[in-house]
Amino acid sequence: MKKTIMASSLAVALGVTGYAAGTGHQAHAAEVNVDQAHLVDLAHNHQDQLNAAPIKDGAYDIHFVKDGFQYNFTSNGTTWSWSYEAANGQTAGFSNVAGADYTTSYNQGSNVQSVSYNAQSSNSNVEAVSAPTYHNYSTSTTSSSVRLSNGNTAGATGSSAAQIMAQRTGVSASTWAAIIARESNGQVNAYNPSGASGLFQTMPGWGPTNTVDQQINAAVKAYKAQGLGAWGF
């Protein structure tokens, strides 16, 4: 079911006060009373909250840099979007457009392989669908062509995650794509009764796997601790 999202606000939680943005005005953190640390935490660990509501009522256009990332939060008073971008240009974010399905990506811009999710209802699982050109969860390279003998692939989401893992670990994207294909067949919500979950089928001890970001972070932790041996290599 497509949803038209009205601007219920996160302002109380974030402490955003005393700001009304005009069209085209870009506000840095110094221009508004913004809890930057909380916004950063939401962007990395609680994306569902940012997806569900704008950070304040009314229009705003807020940008700031913290710990090597550029963070962007915008709204026209009805629809809103957010994203964060590392120094190397790799981005992760969410665009919420009234009357449209949710779309997310790891990178934005043209000529980019991207991934989006089609939320059928507020309680439904998400599935990969064709990508938009707006803020999206993808990498700047095309999807991997890895396909296992049993037909498993990393899928679009998994291929994007494999590219990011390659950047963060130095292990080739094709290796990570093969791991994802074998472990989860590219299914973000894959779950094993043993407790392993996500694209990489990491155990709970490596961290939560509610979002793609969290799954990548958990896989990086597992790799740093055990190398590819964590996946039997």
From Swiss-Prot:
GO CC, one annotated term: extracellular region
Knockout or disruption consequences: Up-regulation of ssaA and sceD. Its inactivation shows no clumping and results in an apparent increased degree of cell separation which could be due to the up-regulation of sceD. Inactivation of both isaA and sceD genes results in a high degree of clumping and the double mutant is also attenuated for virulence.
One of the Pfam families matching this protein, by short name: SLT
Entry keyword set: Glycosidase, Hydrolase, Secreted, Signal
Induction trigger: Increased expression in vivo during human sepsis. Highly expressed under biofilm conditions after 8 hours of growth. Positively regulated by SarA and the two-component system YycFG. Also positively regulated by the two-component sensor-regulator SrrAB under aerated conditions. More protein is secreted in a secG or double secG/secY2 mutant (at protein level).
Signal peptide as annotated in the record: 1-29
UniProt-listed InterPro entries: Lysozyme-like_dom_sf, Transglycosylase_SLT_dom_1
EC number(s) from the headed UniProt entry: 3.2.-.-
GO molecular function: hydrolase activity, acting on glycosyl bonds
Coarse class of the protein's main subcellular location: secreted
Localization: Secreted
Gene3D superfamilies to which the protein is assigned, alphabetical: 1.10.530.10
Entry's family note: Belongs to the transglycosylase family. IsaA subfamily.
Function: Is able to cleave peptidoglycan.
Protein name: Probable transglycosylase IsaA
